[in-house]
Amino acid sequence: MATVIRLTRMGRKKQPFYRIAVTDSRKRRDGGWIELIGHHNPMVAEKTTVVDNERLDYWLSVGAKMSDRVKKITGR
């Protein structure tokens, strides 16, 4: 199973926030996920991002790939 760390969209129309989720790469964007490891809210004045770095490091160590957007948000 190829795992990927990517964003899943939540929120209302024109007011999104995103969960940072570990999921199977074959699932759809908002499909099932294995674990939620954080969230990102781009709609507030100061964009807030919360990530559980311990779990992020774990998933990277077992071979999960990060999407380009998650790399940019987390600064890795």
Curated annotation (Swiss-Prot):
The keyword Acetylation does not apply. It holds the Pfam family Ribosomal_S16. One of its GO terms (cellular component) is small ribosomal subunit. It comes from the Bacteria. PROSITE patterns: RIBOSOMAL_S16. GO terms for molecular function: structural constituent of ribosome. GO terms for biological process: translation. Keywords: Ribonucleoprotein, Ribosomal protein. InterPro entries: Ribosomal_bS16, Ribosomal_bS16_CS, Ribosomal_bS16_dom_sf. NCBIfam families: S16 (TIGR00002). Belongs to the bacterial ribosomal protein bS16 family. HAMAP family: Ribosomal_bS16 (MF_00385). This is Small ribosomal subunit protein bS16. It comes from Sulfurimonas denitrificans (strain ATCC 33889 / DSM 1251). The lineage of its organism: Bacteria, Pseudomonadati, Campylobacterota, Epsilonproteobacteria, Campylobacterales. The gene is rpsP.
